[in-house]
Amino acid sequence: MPKSHRPHGRRLSTLTVVLSIGALLGGPAVASAANDTAGFITQAPAQLRPLVDGVDVKPLLTVGEQIGSYRFESIPDGIAIDPRGHTTFDLYVNHETSKVPFPFTPATGIGLVDFDNAQLSHLVMKRGSGRILSGEYAIPSSANYQRFCSNFFAGPEQGWSRPLVLTNEEATDFVNRTGTAWPAGAGAEQAGLAVAYDPATGAFRSIYGLGRMNHENSVAIPGYGEAVLVTGDDTFSAPASQLYMYKAANADGVWNDTGHLWAFQSDNAAINDYGDLSGSASVSGHFIAVPDAIADGDQTGLETWSNANHVFQFIRIEDLAYDRNDHHIVYFADTGEPRAVRNAAGLLSRAPAGTEGPFPNGRIFKMVLDETDPTVVDSLSVLIDGDAGGYRNVGALHQPDNIETTENSLLITEDPGGHNRFAGATNARLWKYDFATGDMTAVAVVSDPTADWESSGVVDASQYFGNGAFLINVQAHNVFVETNPTPVNPAGLTQKREGGQLLLIRIEGA
């Protein structure tokens, strides 16, 4: 049975002090609980702005601000909302931080590193206003997880009698799980795990059976009478990504890791990778069982097994979401890769930097699962083809990253690659795709027009804020709220706390 952890001192920090974060974020952000409206809300400028009428943006919490002893840490990413709240509710925010330096030059010891390992924030928020009443770290830095990306709250809506927050490491590094995470020593293990957090007990544990890969998200699909999770490999070595499914008897089976991993395989050997699908074409398929030893092993073993067993090869799978009107439909983003080209054998491979291949912008895929057996795929097709827009096209979707669905729309965040930062380009946008009409509209963009910023973690918050309301994060990568020479790691490393913000966005008609 997997070992679970309970962080010490889990009492929530209530609002007593707010930290000024300085001119880099537009001046000090100061507020007090001793006013006519309880709870904290940032006074920093919004890091996201509307692009069309009918869109309203409200900043809620900015990196570096404190609520009691809790500080909102850098690189906020996935957001999961507990739907069981009333006048207040719980939300869980991932932090994509790591104490493994990146970038890093081993020969010189020069590089950048975050102050903390990955963490999962637990915030209590007021319905309607978005004011934050308290905060804590549900999964602390001391757990030595790396780069939490997207997350998902699985509960009654997905048929889970035991609610769990599922979070995910997007990392390949070998790290120590106790003590100092890096550099790796004896007994270190490779990162790339899915992690389950139990809100009822505060315990968390690694779910090794969900596979070791660059997990972006693990999303629970309702309607099958068992726990069904879909996940993908957000590989750093694109094009080398696969779509996986984890099945267990129920939520307890996920918690105890008694489920098994499955991998998607096409029914047509001639349509077996990202480039084989285009236009309105589709292919059926099925998920094949992955041996437990492979699923529990390292990332190289899983990649090797997937190639040997002709698992469908995507380029770089990002976030996933199911259709709110038909739960058997799953949408997922693939960010594309300009260096992805076919080699002499006709297989997708990675060409040198500067290559302008046929897949520069990415896609949104649509997968229709069988209504009774989730391992049977009725069809896989391309819903939105950003690649068709070509290079240096402002109007094209650029590197889709996080996604969310409502009954009406699909919301898509961008994380543009360097090749999409051309003269005249816009910065990272939030798009709305209308299911009824197929129209794509860019509804918001990060506030800095040129810097390395992205929006992330978009999640439907209409239950607590009304129709068309979402929570979303911004990662302001080039804004360093705080830096410090590292006291114990090799000379030349600088600790940094990147800027970012949690916001409420309302989108009319979404």
Model region roles, listed by residue range:
Residues A31-A510:
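Sequence/structural signature of beta-propeller domains
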Residues H5-A33:
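Secretory targeting and sorting signals
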